[in-house]
Regions:
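Conserved alpha/beta enzyme-core scaffold
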Residues: 1-438
């Protein structure tokens, strides 16, 4: 049987597709933009047919309808990341969070530590050779498809076709549902004065020829905005967003000095707007690879002049970085922060640097501020990057390097880049903590 006949025979309605899910099954979604919205909606609509179905995924941009209390007998969320649609279920006790470094997710799948019965994913229509394309993600989704007992795909012609480990043959899919839904879009964040200042500070640490890892949001975009005069920048990053396009078009990013995959931007997933997805379509400069390769610290270390930029919710006097929890509440997940912090530290040329960039304070609705630089992390908070790995901390008030400093000097450097309104209080805490004058 040829692939075209296979495809036609396996086409079905969303309802028929989700009937392949059985009570007690474990279901994994495609990551981020590859979450098949039509199939997820059909699964929730079919909830009465299920009992004890476990849902697993990393970043989800959906509403997390399956986590609502009324579905507690039907679905249970056990995620490797918490987002807006899922963190409440974990907080309320009918969902769970599973800590794992992003680079290890495909490894866990292969070793059976993260097991599932059904993979639901979004793919492009098959090409003339019978291969569908993941388009915006290789991440763990590629491995999930290879390992699942049953694979259900929403076929969406809005997905771009990309180079790398993104091709899935029709024979590997058990059911196809054609539905051209709009792709999730994450509009560029507004860059304010604080983010601009942080971007300027970070830019002073980035030389011509650097290879960058950075994420999505106002701070990464602010950093990129300050790099348009740089030459021969490269990308080896867990993800990219729209801000990278401006630097490619300006000629600042051309990957010409990369020591690994010269001339290519290496990423594991995309998250942005239609502009980014159009940029990615059939673009040989952009290559998507699984996260156990892209985020593998040993692979990251092969890039000369490597710079990683990540964020934090809190940093204490010792340099401990909290990026995925607020006290005892799980807020997100580790993502690739530690993967890249460690990879950069292992860089073979000895020039890699990692930056944790964040506003100095969080502003509450009533206008009061909470310092992100604190003597101690909050009770119950989980350390993301530990004090032995942390390198640079950047706020709008400056740069504090942690490596090469004892604990007192680390605390002094951090207090000097804290918000001016909290510095005196932090100095008092310093005296209490270290029995020494500031």
């Amino acid at each position: 049987m040829g692939w075209k006949e296979t495809y036609e025979n396996r086409k079905c309605t969303p309802q028929d597709a989700v009937n392949l899910i059985k009570s007690g099954d474990r279901v994994i979604f495609g990551h981020c933009i590859c979450e098949p919205t039509v199939l997820v909606d059909a699964m929730v609509a079919n909830a009465d047919a299920y009992r004890d179905v476990t849902i697993t995924h990393m970043v989800s941009l959906g509403t997390g309808e399956y986590t609502k209390p009324e579905y507690k007998d039907n679905f249970r969320f056990e995620g490797i990341f918490c987002g807006a649609g899922t963190r409440k279920s974990v907080e309320q006790g009918h969902g769970d969070f599973m800590p794992v470094y992003f680079n290890e997710v495909p490894v866990w799948i292969r070793r059976g530590l993260l097991n599932f019965d059904v993979c639901m994913v979004m793919l492009s229509p098959p090409n003339e050779k019978g291969y569908c394309n993941l388009g915006v993600e290789s991440g763990y989704t590629y491995q999930a498809i290879k390992s699942a007992k049953t694979v259900i795909a929403q076929i969406n012609s809005n997905l771009p076709s990309t180079y790398g480990d993104t091709c899935i043959h029709v024979d590997e899919i058990d059911a196809f549902v054609e539905a051209d839904t709009p792709l999730f879009e994450s509009a560029p964040a507004k860059i304010g004065e604080v983010e601009t200042a942080i971007g300027k500070h970070c830019a002073t640490l980035i030389e011509d020829g650097a290879t960058l890892q950075l994420g999505i949001g106002a701070i990464p975009d602010a950093v990129l905005a300050e790099l348009k005069d740089r030459k021969n920048l490269g990308i080896h990053s867990e993800m990219i967003a729209d801000g990278v396009i401006d630097l490619v078009e300006a000629g600042a990013i051309n990957c010409s000095e990369k020591t690994l995959h010269n001339g290519k931007m290496i990423v594991t997933f995309l998250m942005g707007t239609k502009r980014l997805y159009d940029f990615a379509h059939n673009n040989p400069m952009l290559v998507l690879k699984p996260v156990d390769y892209v985020n593998n610290p040993a692979v990251v270390a092969k890039n000369n002049n490597m710079v990683s930029i990540n964020s934090a919710l809190q940093v204490d006097f010792m340099g401990q970085v909290v990026a995925c929890s607020i006290g005892t509440k799980q807020f997100s997940g580790v993502g690739g922060q530690v993967d890249f912090v460690r990879g950069v530290a292992m860089a073979e040329d000895g020039k890699g640097i990692s930056i944790i960039a964040m506003p100095s304070v969080t502003k509450k609705k009533d206008g009061t501020i909470i310092s992100k630089i604190t003597p101690y992390i909050d009770h119950g908070a989980a350390v993301t990057t530990n004090r032995y790995d942390v390198d640079y901390i950047v706020t709008e008030y400056g740069i504090a390097r942690m490596k090469g400093k004892n604990l007192k000097d680390r605390a002094r450097a951090l207090i000097n880049i804290a918000h001016p309104d909290v510095r005196e209080g932090l100095k008092d805490e310093f005296a209490n903590r270290f029995n020494a004058a500031f």
